[in-house]
């Protein structure tokens, strides 16, 4: 990222972006690895964060109730704590698998497990009322990954299945796109209709605008494929890359509203192939090392916590296809904190009973 700051088209913006990211990583990852040498600090971090999150959830649900739990008000009722419902739901998804694990972990007292059950229920209600489709998809994928661990399905079979799915998509992509374009169901408070609207790429303004941003990021990458335009520059540079036929009621000619809506495409535009590959390789490394830690950890509590953390991160890895929040403190704190916990458990706690 530092290298692409030097070659940036807006050096001041890029160095500012670099310093803010460096602050997140230094504070929540590097210092976190030192803090989590003491296993009790891992629990303190999780519980203290969740206690504050529960207060925000209570505030959000109370405000949402004043607007009859409408889908439109769900977008902003969590402000000023979160900018919108997507970041709010993403954080809930990070912690939800951990507390489900607490319910079934007999290392905890009955009281703690009961409290974890009620917190899980609150998270479930909050997630439902957020009307955040990306978060729902993330949770669905995490559930699928859980069953892979539960039934000990071999990695080769999983990779073969994913490869076959990708191959079938490319073979039938024309028919698939024609089918998707016939879906005109917009977002709704009706759960079945809201889920159906996920695949609406024709009339749902949120979905179509997201595709517009993705296409802009890809066009920017094609113009500067190696080092990109510079960290943090997408928001200032994407406007000329919009095509009129792809614009929505949300779009602006100035291109002054938001980012690329993808943790994978944002660095592709900002830092070129190097930036995008760096994030993808980190995702692969986290999944691989966490899976190894889960398999070889001797202590059951370590195993359960590892699985909860991994599934929580997977919800964000999936969510990150459609949104990007790691440039904000709201997601950077739990994200880098989770990575610090996993690394610390792998290095210091995996071969002993805590």
Language model: regions and residue ranges:
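Alpha-helical transmembrane segments of multi-pass inner-membrane proteins
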Residues: 1-6, 23-27, 41-74, 81-152, ...
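Long extracytoplasmic/lumenal interhelical loops at the membrane interface
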Residues: 69-79, 201-215, 219, 223, ...
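Transmembrane alpha-helices of multi-pass inner-membrane enzymes
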Residues: 161, 279-282, 307-354
């Amino acid at each position: 990222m530092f290298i692409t700051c030097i070659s940036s088209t807006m050096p001041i913006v890029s160095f500012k972006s670099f310093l803010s990211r460096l602050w997140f990583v230094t504070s929540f990852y590097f210092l976190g690895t030192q803090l989590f040498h003491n296993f009790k600090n891992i629990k303190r971090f999780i519980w203290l964060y969740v206690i504050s999150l529960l207060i925000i959830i209570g505030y959000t649900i109370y405000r949402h109730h004043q607007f009859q739990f409408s889908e439109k008000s769900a977008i902003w009722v969590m402000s000023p704590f979160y900018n919108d419902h997507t970041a709010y739901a993403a954080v809930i998804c990070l912690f939800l698998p951990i507390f489900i694990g607490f319910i079934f972990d007999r290392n905890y007292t009955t009281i703690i497990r009961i409290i974890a059950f009620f917190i899980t229920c609150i998270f479930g209600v909050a997630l439902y009322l957020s009307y955040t489709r990306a978060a729902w998809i993330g949770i669905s994928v995490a559930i699928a990954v859980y069953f892979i661990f539960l039934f000990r399905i071999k990695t080769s079979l999983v990779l073969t299945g994913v490869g076959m799915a990708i191959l079938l998509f490319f073979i039938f992509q024309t028919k698939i796109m024609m089918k998707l374009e016939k879906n005109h169901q917009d977002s709704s408070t009706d759960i079945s209709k809201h889920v159906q609207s996920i695949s609406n790429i024709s009339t749902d303004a949120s979905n179509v605008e997201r595709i517009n941003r993705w296409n802009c990021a890809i066009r920017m990458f094609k113009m500067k494929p190696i080092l990109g335009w510079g960290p943090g520059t997408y928001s200032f540079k994407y406007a000329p890359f919009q095509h009129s036929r792809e614009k929505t009621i949300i779009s602006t000619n100035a291109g002054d509203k938001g980012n690329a809506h993808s943790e994978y495409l944002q660095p592709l535009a900002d830092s070129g192939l190097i930036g995008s590959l760096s994030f993808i390789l980190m995702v692969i490394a986290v999944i691989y090392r966490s899976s190894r830690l889960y398999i070889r950890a001797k202590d059951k509590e370590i195993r359960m916590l590892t699985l909860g953390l991994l599934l929580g991160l997977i919800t964000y890895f999936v969510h990150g296809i459609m949104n990007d929040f790691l440039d904000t403190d709201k997601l950077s704190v739990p994200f880098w904190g989770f990575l610090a916990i996993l690394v610390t458990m792998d290095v210091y706690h995996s071969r002993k009973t805590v």
